[in-house]
From Swiss-Prot:
GO terms for cellular component: cytosol. GO terms for molecular function: thiaminase activity. Belongs to the TenA family. This is Aminopyrimidine aminohydrolase. GO terms for biological process: thiamine biosynthetic process; thiamine diphosphate biosynthetic process. The active site is at 137 (nucleophile), 208 (proton donor). Gene3D superfamilies: Heme oxygenase-like. Keywords: Hydrolase, Thiamine biosynthesis. Pathway: Cofactor biosynthesis; thiamine diphosphate biosynthesis. Substrate binds at residues 44, 141, 167. The keyword Transferase does not apply. It is an enzyme of class 3 (hydrolase). Catalyzes an amino-pyrimidine hydrolysis reaction at the C5' of the pyrimidine moiety of thiamine compounds, a reaction that is part of a thiamine salvage pathway. Thus, catalyzes the conversion of 4-amino-5-aminomethyl-2-methylpyrimidine to 4-amino-5-hydroxymethyl-2-methylpyrimidine (HMP). Is also able to catalyze the hydrolytic cleavage of thiamine; however, this thiaminase activity may not be physiologically relevant. Therefore, is probably involved in the regeneration of the thiamine pyrimidine from thiamine degraded products present in the environment, rather than in thiamine degradation. It comes from Staphylococcus aureus (strain NCTC 8325 / PS 47).
Length: 229
């Protein structure tokens, strides 16, 4: 079994939990609230900006010009292509995407996730660690979306179905490239090192779950604690 497949197998329980959590279930039914969608879009805009910067940090670590070219193309996709998925949700809210993200949010779950990825990029020379931190994002979105396509709970009468349709196909290229790079780099690594990479991957899967849940709870920093009247 290739290394990437071992990672996916280990991540299955987490992905199952994400699918059953409120965010995805409400998206499937089309009953998700506008406040949750706004919070998600604002947080995801901040997240994707940093995710794009991480692609730029990966480029110097690449040995293949084909990989460099693909990462440059992915930067363009993050800036332009994925906005299509955001526009779907913004239309459901009834506001333009640009208007929604004018108000920035940086919730704890997004903060911790981004810092986890940056730590790998800056502290590890081997690109496999950075990729292992980044790869769960496209992989989990694709897995959730593909699973939705055969789920009777997917409400085709609601526009949220279009969001699942988008991610059911649009992540395949980056998933394949990340897989190929990780599998190649894994060949020359020890079992102990690969266990560390696996840990990085699974931590990002947990961060993905917390990110979705963040939207449902309208998570924010509570520096003064909660006040109980």
């Amino acid at each position: 079994m290739e290394f990437s497949q071992k990672l996916y197998q280990a991540a299955k329980p987490i992905i199952n939990d994400i699918y059953e959590d409120d965010f995805i279930q409400k998206m499937l039914s089309g009953d998700i609230g506008a406040d949750a969608l706004r919070h998600y879009l604002k947080a995801d805009a901040a997240y994707l900006k940093e995710f794009t910067n991480l692609y730029a940090l990966l480029i110097p670590k690449m040995n293949s010009m084909n990989d460099v070219k693909f990462l440059v193309e992915q930067i363009e996709f993050m800036v332009e292509g994925e906005v299509l998925a955001h526009d779907i949700l913004a239309q459901i809210v009834g506001e333009s995407y640009e208007e929604i993200i004018k108000t920035k949010v940086w919730p704890p779950s997004g903060d911790h996730y981004i810092k986890h990825m940056y730590f790998q990029a800056h502290s590890r020379e081997n690109a496999i660690y950075t990729i292992a931190a980044m790869a769960p994002c496209p992989y989990i979105y694709a897995e959730l979306a593909k699973r939705s396509q055969s789920d009777h709970k997917l409400n085709r009468e609601k526009d949220t179905a279009k969001w699942f349709d988008f991610y059911s196909t649009e992540m395949d290229d980056i998933i394949n490239v990340f897989e190929a790079i990780m599998n190649k780099l894994a060949e020359s690594m020890s079992d102990k090192e690969l266990e560390q990479v696996k840990q990085v991957f699974l931590e990002s899967c947990i961060h993905e779950r917390r990110f979705f849940n963040m939207a449902m709870t309208l998570e924010q920093w509570e520096f003064g604690g909660k006040v109980n009247d």
